[in-house]
Amino acid sequence: MSVGKYLTIIALIVIYISETKANPYQMQWMAYPHPDDTAQVWFRNSYEIAERPVTARITIASTGYFELYVNERNVTGDVLTPLRERCSANAIAVTYDVTRFMRAGTNTVAVWYSPSFPHPESRQIALSFYGRAGDGSPEVFDNNSSWLCRKAVNSLSTEGHELLGMAETEPKWNAEDIDVARWLPARIVGDNECVPIEHRSRMYEATRISRIRQQKYFDIEGDSVVYDFGEAFVGLVRVTLRDAVKGQNMRIGDMRYVCSGEADEQAIQRFTTTDCRRLLISGDENFDNAQIQKVEALETETYTRDMKE
């Protein structure tokens, strides 16, 4: 055998091993140490990388919904990721090319997780982070023992609707330079039970925002305001507020929102959808309909995503 062929075989073996390590079926599951039925969870980890990798990919599996961030940039792209059947908790993995978000030095990977419906889940996310160095050699960046987590400001109600907390209480949860004193080590699921994972890597069905529109008209009914969109929609609701009181409670359809008290703020669903034509907004004793600056319906649609585009 020639030296060239020998080196080629060795290179192929190295590539195979690196890809095997990054195989989503071999990823280790993790969860908040004390999972409950309704909590959304933030996960984060920091990686020290001497040189910016030539390529970098993250394969993330989840039994619920997630948003993936690298250095504060949302790399997920779609909404309600991954697309799944209602009230399902099967494990689904998606692979993302995160090369353009990488840098030399500290790289922070963060995940916002939500259960797909109210239920306790011992396996929440699993993640594999890998790529290639400047010399072409494979790199696996995983360090499961360093993952931290804490409950997010949002959660689900027992009926499966979204409860939005005050975002200003942790505005930079996915950034590098935050105080992690109140964060806990993620619980690594150590059993050997095989969990089937549906892996979506090239072309798959996903959900995106297809149209944004405002109401046709609104009516003031007592202490509430009803916004009529003319025709029913399925998607997210986004409400822009001004001069709300910090801690003020609002009901926006089935969604609950606690105001941050900033001059301008937005309440928007993240992991649930609304299906309606008329949207009722009300609040506590501090609520004033003049606080509502804009109400928008962000209609969603299912499409085929091509990760090679």
Language model features with spans:
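Extracellular/oxidizing-compartment recognition motifs
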Residues: 23-309
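Bacterial Sec-dependent signal peptides at the C-terminal "C-region" and cleavage site
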Residues: 14-26
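N-terminal secretory signal peptides that target proteins for export/translocation
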Residues: 1-2
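Sec-dependent N-terminal signal peptides
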Residues: 6-15
